């Protein structure tokens, strides 16, 4: 069996981020223990959907994607974001599994009410949201990373199959830094704060 794993990290606030890529590689390596072959690729290296500023890459995308699919011949595809790449996989009739790491629908709502208030940007958000809904609806299965998100998926796509994907974190890959001098008792919080609304909650700590 062959599984194509596609990492969508690398755009927006996660530009040059490798964290999610490492997690997907670990998953792929684990699959090999069960005689499953995998290929891990960066989504933007093979396909860019519309709207985009990279028109040259957009027009050459389908050719690159066709070559990738024809050479690797995947039995299934796992993507970690809801984009045109996933939509193209659905159109080709290949089973698609969508990894969902956050409350996508809340993110869209918050984005339109804060940083994307202009008519043009709101339209772009709407177009991408429409693509995402098609990906969710047409996927073989949605894989939220926790039970809470599974309930959220059921609210938006009640008939779609979903199961919790326990990703886990390998702390051996963390960068070492000098410790902080803390006054005990204290509480530590670790957060991947690359989404604006999530960082807002940290302001609560100023009052604690």
Q: What do these predicted regions represent?
A:
Residues 1-44, 207:
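N-terminal subdomain of nucleotide-sugar transferases
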């Amino acid at each position: 069996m062959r599984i194509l794993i596609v990492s969508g990290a690398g755009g927006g606030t996660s530009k040059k981020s490798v964290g999610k890529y490492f997690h997907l590689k670990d998953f792929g390596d684990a699959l090999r223990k069960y005689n499953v072959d995998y290929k891990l690729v960066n989504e933007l290296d093979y396909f860019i959907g519309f709207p985009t500023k990279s028109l040259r890459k957009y027009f050459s995308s389908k050719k690159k994607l066709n070559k990738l699919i024809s050479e690797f011949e995947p039995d299934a595809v796992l993507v970690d974001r809801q984009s045109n790449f996933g939509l193209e996989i659905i159109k080709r009739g290949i089973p698609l599994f969508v990894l969902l790491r956050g409350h996508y629908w809340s993110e869209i709502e918050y984005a339109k009410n804060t940083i994307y208030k202009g008519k043009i940007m709101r339209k772009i958000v709407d177009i991408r949201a429409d693509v995402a809904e098609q990906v969710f609806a047409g996927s073989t299965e949605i894989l939220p990373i926790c039970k809470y998100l599974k309930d959220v998926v059921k609210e938006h796509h009640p008939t779609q199959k979903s199961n919790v994907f326990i990703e886990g974190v390998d702390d051996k890959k963390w960068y070492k830094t000098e410790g902080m001098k803390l006054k005990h008792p204290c509480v530590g919080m670790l957060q991947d704060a690359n989404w604006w609304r999530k960082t807002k909650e940290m302001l609560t700590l100023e009052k604690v």
